[in-house]
Amino acid sequence: MRSVRMRAELDGMHVSGAERVIPHYELEKVVMELLKRPKRYDKIVITIERVENLETIPKSLPIKSHDFADVEQAHEFVIKKLKEIGIEESITQKALKLLTEGPNPKGGNMRGAVLMDPVSGERLEPDQERGIRTTRIDWRNRTAIKEALRERGIKKFYLERLIDALAIATKNIHCGVIAEICWSDDPEYTTGYIASKEFGYIRIKPMKEEHTPTGGRVYFVKRESLQELIECLERKVMLIEQLL
């Protein structure tokens, strides 16, 4: 097996990323697919690694979807769901504000996720400009998962984003993330999600206003197991067997 990761930049800013965990004989086809994925870039990096140890996750998080009239209502729903699992409104508000304004201390977005203490709201990631990236995750049979999502009524426009985001969220919860809030930094894509072990993966629209270039991820995590969690998110290679 091989881990293949793509990262694209434009004017020094991260604009696209994707990855696969695949048999070696699919390498050429998958690399070509990843090269075509960014719309615009002036730098693209493809990283290919041999996989020595592979773990499996039996099933993905269950998927639900909610559409709201505006961002305010969507964020109120996020606050409500996270409060149900013990995260206070003030902490969730801080996370939402970070993603709305841009979580990078120097302004704008980060390549990785914010790690946030769910009690104090303190940021825990070692590098607040880089964040923590969930990598080395894919589906055992990506084609079958796509077809299953199509049969559930997921439109083609959302399909690639959903299949990647669901894989990341599933690995996050498997590694020990308590809950996640995420939306894209793509100015034209307003759908985001929240995820946890308790309520699964909930797609939410709109999580931000149209034409807004900020976004990212906040992971609520336990301070006590931080290093073990980071190692799991960034280094362990995993495949998800089935869609729940």
Swiss-Prot record:
Q: Give one GO molecular function term.
A: magnesium ion binding
Q: What's the stated role of this polypeptide?
A: Catalyzes the transformation of pimelate into pimeloyl-CoA with concomitant hydrolysis of ATP to AMP.
Q: What is this protein called?
A: 6-carboxyhexanoate--CoA ligase
A Gene Ontology biological process noted in the UniProt record is:
biotin biosynthetic process
- Known InterPro entries for this protein? BioW (IPR005499)
**NCBIfam families with a match to the protein in the record:** bioW, PRK01322.1
Pathway it belongs to? Metabolic intermediate metabolism; pimeloyl-CoA biosynthesis; pimeloyl-CoA from pimelate: step 1/1
Assembly information from the UniProt record: Homodimer.
- A Pfam match is BioW
Q: Say which family it is in.
A: Belongs to the BioW family.
Q: Which UniProt keywords apply?
A: ATP-binding, Biotin biosynthesis, Ligase, Magnesium, Nucleotide-binding
**Classification via HAMAP family:** BioW
Which cofactors go with this protein? Answer: Mg(2+)
The protein's annotated catalytic reaction(s) are:
heptanedioate + ATP + CoA = 6-carboxyhexanoyl-CoA + AMP + diphosphate
